[in-house]
Regions:
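Outer-envelope exported proteins of Gram-negative bacteria
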Residues: 13-15, 214, 241, 253-255, ...
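Phosphate/oxyanion-binding active-site loops and adjacent basic polyanion-contact surfaces
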Residues: 30-34, 93, 232, 272-278, ...
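Outer-membrane beta-barrel "beta-signal"
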Residues: 280, 284-286, 330-347
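Outer membrane beta-barrel
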Residues: 1-71, 94-116, 301-309
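Detector for outer-membrane/organellar transmembrane beta-barrel domains
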Residues: 99-267, 272-280, 284
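Surface-exposed loop and membrane-interface regions of Gram-negative outer-membrane beta-barrel proteins
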Residues: 1-8, 18-31, 64-66, 70-90, ...
Length: 347
């Protein structure tokens, strides 16, 4: 600090760090996550607000092409050209440069408006010798976000509009911080994809009663690829979590949640996954009236209902059986009751 005479709070930094991460704690989801090795200046005074900008360089050196893909493309080496070689598992190094700029200001009493943008520039390391040819070049990724925090006597609320453009727009419930190398190699070209994400989440407290909520919606399109590749998707999620404080260290809490996700493919087909949950828990923590208080011990029972056949339970039934790679036989179920204990701590 104290590097600039016109801005005493400005900080110049260099090194490895988590940088201005934004998280929806109810979903345990970081919707803005830029991190790694880099440098920058943050909280510089500019007009009525604060300006921050940073540069990061991330290396994805464990990225590899699956062996079966060698039958679909050509594997190139500097001293020769191989075709259809199933015995080779090609690897390459992709360095992603990330340029982040952010400006925040007090929009009115009790409110904070934040404007942020990030440019992701992927670069293939030519010194690694091996790469898959005849594949689309990775395009740049872009993230733009506008968020508004409101703080009031009963609690707080955050509203976000986020736009993601390019190969970092591949998945719902994503944050745009990574380039979707895998899908690009597998034929699902997301270079021209774009995604909108809308979030609203917060908490309030009235006496011994508290309440938290999370609302999320996303829609994306512009994907290209094979007939079975994704063309577009959309998803919606809503969660409410009321609680009642029993003592200084205990409370009863409930949680109701719903999600739906629809994916449309290039061949016109589509599929939808959706589910609901209901949880009731007895909770112990040092300050039961504060939802951030940790460590927190929960004794809970949860009811789940879903049409997602990935939610499988072991069954001796041979009807509609699913055989896993290890030979275990499962039968799909659309509902389940789970109970147990859970300990959560933050540090």
């Amino acid at each position: 600090k104290n590097v600039f005479s016109f801005s005493k709070d400005a900080t110049v930094w260099v090194g490895k760090r988590y940088y201005h991460r934004e998280e929806n704690h109810m979903l345990d989801w970081k919707w803005y996550q830029i991190e790694g090795f880099g440098t920058g200046i943050e909280y510089m005074d500019l007009g009525p607000g604060k300006l921050s900008f940073a540069w990061f360089s991330n290396t994805d050196n464990d990225f590899s092409y699956e062996k079966q893909l060698n039958n679909n493309g050509k594997v190139q080496k500097k001293d020769g050209l191989w075709e259809g070689d199933d015995s080779w598992d090609g690897k390459t190094v992709v360095v992603t440069e990330k340029y982040d700029i952010e400006y925040g200001l007090t929009s009115w009493d009790g409110a904070w408006l934040n404007l942020r943008g990030t440019l992701l520039v992927p670069e293939v390391d030519d010194n690694n010798y091996m790469k898959l040819v005849d594949q689309p070049k990775f395009s740049n990724g872009n993230i733009l976000a506008v968020s508004l925090d409101n703080y009031y006597s009963l609690g707080s609320c955050k509203t976000v509009v986020q736009y993601i453009k390019g190969p970092n727009a591949a998945t719902p419930f994503g944050n745009g911080s990574w380039i979707d190398y895998w899908s690009l190699v597998k034929g699902n070209n997301s270079n021209d994809a774009h995604r909108w994400q809308f979030l609203n989440y917060g908490d309030m407290k009235i006496g011994d009663f508290g309440f938290a909520h999370s609302l999320y919606y996303t829609v994306a399109s512009g994907f290209e690829g094979w007939e079975t590749s994704k063309e577009s998707d959309k998803a919606f999620s809503f969660v409410v979590r009321p609680y009642y404080k029993l003592t200084d260290i205990s409370k009863i809490t409930a949680e109701l949640g719903f999600f739906t996700e629809t994916t449309k493919y290039q061949n016109g087909e589509s599929e939808n996954y959706q589910g609901q949950k209901a949880t009731l828990a007895y909770v112990l923590s040092p300050d039961a009236g504060n939802w951030k208080s940790r460590p927190e011990l929960r004794f809970y029972v949860t009811y789940l209902h879903s049409n997602d056949t990935q939610a499988l339970v072991e069954s001796p039934s041979q009807d509609k059986k699913v055989v896993m790679n290890d030979g275990t036989t499962y039968a799909p179920r659309d509902n389940q009751v789970i109970f147990g204990a859970q300990l959560e701590a933050w540090w």
